């Protein structure tokens, strides 16, 4: 068996992914329940919230690529990069899943450099706000300045709602023929509750 059951009851085949089985609601739900850094954060912090952060850092015209740059992890998980280097077969599976997701949402599988740059800025910010202060030097973060705004981790339901809200904002902007502007951070509980009420429970789109 080379397939898995998705949150909506569909099927994702790792060997030959069916684009019709890739839904933004499944991606949002799964990423909202996957913790960054394989769970070694001071508080739960999801890949979904990380993805929204990256979508805000990139230029507006690349917001969708920023939001979905880790969308394949909804199907293959978020393996730590040092471990990926020891499991070459995983990278091939990851690349196949990413190619399918990118095609499904009209993205070039080769992401623009600004997405990688934004990912590194997000990493620097996450290290400052969420990881233990171990004093070690991360070469990948040399000369990288974290964002001024601190990260307030959201629970999985709020992160899922935030991801879907951001996706719909970007999609609406694309339909109008304009680039999506970064949306404000939902740091207030009332806004979080409103987002949850609006978007949690949506079916696949």
Each PLM stretch: what is its role?
Residues 1-205:
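Metal-dependent phosphohydrolase cores
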């Amino acid at each position: 068996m080379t397939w898995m059951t998705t949150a909506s009851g569909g099927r994702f085949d790792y060997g030959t992914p069916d684009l019709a089985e890739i839904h933004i609601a499944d991606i949002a739900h799964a990423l909202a329940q996957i913790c960054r850094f394989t769970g070694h954060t001071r508080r739960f912090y999801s890949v979904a919230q990380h993805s929204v952060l990256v979508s805000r850092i990139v230029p507006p015209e690349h917001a969708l690529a920023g939001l979905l740059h880790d969308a394949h992890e909804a199907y293959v998980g978020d393996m730590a990069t040092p471990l990926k280097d020891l499991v070459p077969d995983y990278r091939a599976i990851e690349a196949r899943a990413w190619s399918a997701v990118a095609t499904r949402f009209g993205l070039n599988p080769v992401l623009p450099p600004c997405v990688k740059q934004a990912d590194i800025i997000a990493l620097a910010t996450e290290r400052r706000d969420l990881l233990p202060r171990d004093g070690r030097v991360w070469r990948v973060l040399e000369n990288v300045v974290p964002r001024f705004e601190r990260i307030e981790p959201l629970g999985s339901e709020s992160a899922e709602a935030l991801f879907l809200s951001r996706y719909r904002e970007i999609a609406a902007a694309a339909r109008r023929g304009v680039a999506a502007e970064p949306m404000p951070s939902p740091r207030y509980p009332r806004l979080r509750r409103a987002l949850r009420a609006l978007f949690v429970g949506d079916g696949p789109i």
